[in-house]
Amino acid sequence: MVKCKLFFWLISWFLKVKNGEKVWKFLKSCPENCYSEPQFAFIGRSNVGKSTLINALANKKIAKTSTKPGRTQLLNFYKNESEKLFVDLPGYGYAAVSKTKKHQIDRIIAGYFQKDQPISAVFLILDARVGFTNLDYIMIEYIIQQGFKLHILANKIDKTNQSTRAILLNQCKKLKLNCLLISAKNKNNLSKLQELLE
């Protein structure tokens, strides 16, 4: 009976992959990097939609989301159907957490972005309605100083107008950074993001 269930599960998994359906899985949560494989890192201020983006890429809910900022407080690791590794980092800049918790999150982020980490690329996610904040600029400078490839993802563009989007792209141009306007909710431009993850 167990072998029969396993067989049908494998057939189902194969058909999903063949039909282009995303087969992602959650691995584990860690206070530090617990994998030595190359990985893509997602970081941003609290409540910019990092976990929602993971779910959109996976085409299913594998990352916990919340309207309350500060939900993610550890490094959350995922793998996609191509066995590529993704990391959802804690959000920075959430004022409502205690100083102790804030320092803990800062240590986790700083510890992750050490120069010897196997990071293929970092994707810094913004809330397109808010744009760049001082904390974002600090994080951008830090990541670049550490020598990692950096992309900007301006999320929630479905809630912005053309003028706001133009301003964001101009700011990215001044920073000499690749910027992609996306909506994790409506899946706008996720195919372009997938190309960056190849």
Curated annotation (Swiss-Prot):
GO molecular function: GTP binding; metal ion binding
Keywords tagged on the record: Cell cycle, Cell division, GTP-binding, Magnesium, Metal-binding, Nucleotide-binding, Septation
Ranges of residues in domain EngB-type G: 36-198
One Gene Ontology cellular component: cytosol
Coiled coil residues, start to end: none
InterPro entries: G_ENGB_dom, GTP-bd, GTP-bd_ribosome_bio_YsxC, P-loop_NTPase, Small_GTP-bd
Residues that hold Mg(2+) according to the record: 51, 72
Cofactors (names): Mg(2+)
Binding-site positions, GTP: 44-51, 70-74, 88-91, 155-158, 182-184
Pfam families hit by this protein: MMR_HSR1 (PF01926)
Record-annotated membrane-spanning stretches: none
NCBIfam families the record matches: GTPase_YsxC (TIGR03598), small_GTP (TIGR00231)
Family: Belongs to the TRAFAC class TrmE-Era-EngA-EngB-Septin-like GTPase superfamily. EngB GTPase family.
Protein name: Probable GTP-binding protein EngB
